[in-house]
Amino acid sequence: MSEIILGIESSCDDTSAAVIKDGYLLSNVLASQDVHKAYGGVIPELASRAHQVNIVPVVSEAITRAGIKASDITAIAFTRGPGLLGSLLVGTSFAKGLAMAIDKPLVEVNHLQGHILANFIKQYDSENRQPEFPYLCLLVSGGNSQIVRVNSPLEYEILGQTIDDAVGEAFDKCSKMMGLGYPGGPIVDRLAKQGDPNKFKFSKPHIPGFDYSFSGIKTSLLYFVRDQMALDPEFMEKNKEDICASFQKALIDILMDKLIKAAKHTGIKQITIGGGVSANSGLRARIEEEGRKRGWTTFLPEFKFTTDNAAMIAIAGWFHYQNGERASLDVAPVSRLAEF
């Protein structure tokens, strides 16, 4: 019998619902919130209110596009955390209410696990390349920077992670410092394509093992811009493309140095990336370049699966469902999950 999973994602500022049937994507609907751009970052209260407005039409649209009825659903997978508590509460509450209404089981999903398993989303019109276990996943976003050894769909080992800030936060800070707008990652990436990545140098951390640190390089950028602007008030406007290109290269170098080290240490040559920063064109190109040099088999998620989306929650939920896992109706969202 076919297994149809409805996935619901509401961890931050994107309301999303998706339907997967036996691992194949039938629909993936996303409602983004533009209201946060004016504030230069996500405002939790505004995000929660927008989720309340969007959740019903988004889920209804996902079911309609999938060509199914609510009664056809086998289980409902939802993001329990980590994320903004108010946002998570909307998705969790809706999932529980729908589960009671149609008498279907609930499956809770770790948001980060969804990113890690994004390459397992199958599509009818796609090649559907999938990594073999074990593989390494470079998980990079606004809130996380980790190197994860993935032994199976449900078994993970965090080899390294940031000890302070996430790489996505560094991109946002760069954009904010230069007055470029929000979200910073795509803006910096776009300008970096027009600049010289070797024009300026930024100090890199010396952290043992496979852990990351991005607080120092943010400070390095701050002092660099401040000192140069003191000499020439037009410096940033004249050099914004080169600054973005150089800063982006420095961040990618930091990410890749530890990933290469982890791959050598483990002997694993199946390499994936996940999370919002995995959409960065410079990082994607560098992963593939290193893969060719080092004999890696690399897997890059489609751009639509790099940002927060319910398709990845549905596929992760499918694996949990097949493992016999169910969530109780009194389950509560958690803003921080210490481990998978």
Regions found by a protein language model. Give the residues of each.
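Conserved phosphate-binding/catalytic loops in two-lobed NTP-binding clefts
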Residues: 108-109, 288-313
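Glycine-rich phosphate-binding/hydrolytic loop that grips phosphoryl groups
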Residues: 115-117, 301-339
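Conserved phosphate-binding catalytic cores of ATP/NTP-utilizing and phosphoryl-transfer enzymes
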Residues: 1-2, 109-135, 316
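Short glycine-rich phosphate-binding loop at a beta-alpha junction
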Residues: 69-80, 266-278, 299-302
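Glycine-rich phosphate-binding loop plus the immediately following alpha-helix
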Residues: 113, 151-194, 218-219, 223-227
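N-terminal beta-alpha supersecondary unit
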Residues: 2-82, 111, 115, 243
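Short beta-strand scaffold segments in enzyme catalytic cores
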Residues: 15-20, 137-139, 145-149
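A contiguous, well-structured pocket-lining segment that forms one wall/lid of small-molecule binding clefts
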Residues: 69, 190-271, 280-294, 321-324, ...
